[in-house]
Amino acid sequence: MPGVSVRDVAAQDFINAYASFLQRQGKLEVPGYVDIVKTSSGNEMPPQDAEGWFYKRAASVARHIYMRKQVGVGKLNKLYGGAKSRGVRPYKHIDASGSINRKVLQALEKIGIVEISPKGGRRISENGQRDLDRIAAQTLEEDE
């Protein structure tokens, strides 16, 4: 379908499709500690999907960067952070792990989806935009 972009597809459908594409492709470099690490200091437990959560985070980050001009690690930490349960005290926002978001960006950069922006942060590359649009078109065709 010509003219289909990531904006035309529901976010969850696209993220699941792109995560499965990245997992099938096997080029994304996954750190060895992903099965035991928490994604934020505010979380009590690591993700339940020990095998595929890194691919879903990578797909989500790629979509997030696609929707904006450029994004840095700090903005991703704030985006993927959440509320920390502090017992009887009120909840408080805690940023996500910067190491995980940095490793995701480095892995996406290594396979050519994102590139370093001269203004700071990362932006989507031409090849990355083409790949994401292609996956979005396939996802839209499957939904119809």
UniProtKB/Swiss-Prot annotation:
Q: What is the consequence of disrupting this locus?
A: Disruption of a single RPS19 gene reduces cell growth; a double disruption is lethal. Depletion experiments show the proteins are required for correct maturation of precursor rRNA to generate the 18S small rRNA. A specific site between the 18S and 5.8S precursors (site A2 in ETS1) is not cleaved in disruption mutants. Partially assembled ribosomes are retained in the nucleolus rather than being exported to the cytoplasm. All effects are exacerbated in the double disruption. Increases association of NOC4 with 20S/21S pre-rRNA, decreases association of ENP1, TSR1 and RIO2 with 20S/21S pre-rRNA.
* Classification via Gene3D superfamilies: Winged helix-like DNA-binding domain superfamily/Winged helix DNA-binding domain
Q: Which residues form the signal peptide?
A: none
Q: Might you report a single GO cellular component term?
A: cytosol
Keyword check for rRNA-binding, yes or no: no
Q: Where's it found, cell-wise? A: Cytoplasm
Family matches, as SMART domains = Ribosomal_S19e (SM01413)
Q: How changing residue 102 to E affects the protein?
A: Decreases mature 18S rRNA, protein binds 20S pre-RNA complex poorly. Lethal in double RPS19A/RPS19B mutant
Instruction: Tell me where it mainly resides.
Output: cytoplasm
The Swiss-Prot or TrEMBL record annotates one GO molecular function as: structural constituent of ribosome
Protein role: Component of the ribosome, a large ribonucleoprotein complex responsible for the synthesis of proteins in the cell. The small ribosomal subunit (SSU) binds messenger RNAs (mRNAs) and translates the encoded message by selecting cognate aminoacyl-transfer RNA (tRNA) molecules. The large subunit (LSU) contains the ribosomal catalytic site termed the peptidyl transferase center (PTC), which catalyzes the formation of peptide bonds, thereby polymerizing the amino acids delivered by tRNAs into a polypeptide chain.
What PANTHER family would the database entry show?
A: 40S RIBOSOMAL PROTEIN S19
**Which family is annotated?**
Belongs to the eukaryotic ribosomal protein eS19 family.
Task: Give the note.
Answer: Present with 29000 molecules/cell in log phase SD medium. There are 2 genes for eS19 in yeast.
Q: How does it assemble?
A: Component of the small ribosomal subunit (SSU). Mature yeast ribosomes consist of a small (40S) and a large (60S) subunit. The 40S small subunit contains 1 molecule of ribosomal RNA (18S rRNA) and 33 different proteins (encoded by 57 genes). The large 60S subunit contains 3 rRNA molecules (25S, 5.8S and 5S rRNA) and 46 different proteins (encoded by 81 genes).
Designated name of the protein: Small ribosomal subunit protein eS19A
